[in-house]
Amino acid sequence: MTVLMLIWMSYGPISIALSVVIFCILAVSLKFKSIFYRIVQFDILMNTVFYVNCITYKLKTIEEYHRVLLLIFESYPSLFILREGLSFWAYRFQCSSLLLKCIFRFTYAKYPFAAEIWKKHYRLIMVSTIFYSILLTIPFVFITKEHHGFDYYAFTMNIETVIYLLLTIYLGRLTKLSLKKRSKRFAESIKKLNNYIYCDLFIHGVAFFGVMIPKMLSFEWTEETKDYILTFTVDAINLASTYIIIICDSNLRKILFCHTKKLTTSVFQVSAVPVSKLIVSPQ
């Protein structure tokens, strides 16, 4: 097993399981009825799909699995097209989703009835976001990734990221102006949403300034090094929504850790039962 796979195994399966648990808690618990949590659920669901799709890229670093993958893709070309399509679509969707959350925060801050409108048209908004992000993905399919040592794909992604960054800053400014007209109590209630978006922006900022720009400018890096860096960057973005909501939401943390504590306690209680009581008497 390669070093890449060993590192991934240390956090990958746990993160997938945690994403499923968080998604279920948000769906079932009555404490999370707000439309904001439906958007977070949508994020977690799509990012988990993208994350699972990325596993096939990691498996190709192991020769045995690489041969199996090639055989599968040769037998079912549609699976290969689906994998490549999801990999192209992932970043477009994540940027669109980030912009969607900023729009939600702005409308929620400016219009008192915004939450009801979002709740009423939630499915339409989500479908529109998916459709919009797919349209944005189409041009990137035809962009040559690298030519004469210059990474055109990374360059185009950087331009795309700058555009989204400027849009989020602009919407943030409008939101701040709108909050001045609302009560302090309302401004306090929106703090959780602010923290979530700030963390999301931070992750995208690190990916942009710390990874994508150096990746594009560092011609002396080997392709293997670039692939490793890109793989873990993609993982960070795909897993961000799960860990961010845990960090930002105290109610979710209480439920999550309470369930964990109860599970641990019950395990110890079973172990502490006297042996005599575990023996079934003959009939």
Curated annotation (Swiss-Prot):
Its chief place of residence is membrane
Q: Which GO terms describe its molecular function?
A: transmembrane signaling receptor activity
Superkingdom is Eukaryota
Its transmembrane ranges are 3-23, 35-55, 68-88, 124-144, 152-172, 201-221, 228-248
Choose any GO biological process term that the UniProt entry carries and state it. sensory perception of chemical stimulus
Membrane topology label: Multi-pass membrane protein
- Subcellular location(s) per record: Membrane
* Keyword Chloroplast included in the entry's annotation: no
UniProt keyword annotations, A-Z? Membrane, Transmembrane, Transmembrane helix
Q: What GO cellular component entries does it have? A: membrane
Q: Which family does it belong to?
A: Belongs to the nematode receptor-like protein srg family.
Q: Could you identify this protein by its name?
A: Serpentine receptor class gamma-46
| Source species of the chain | Caenorhabditis elegans
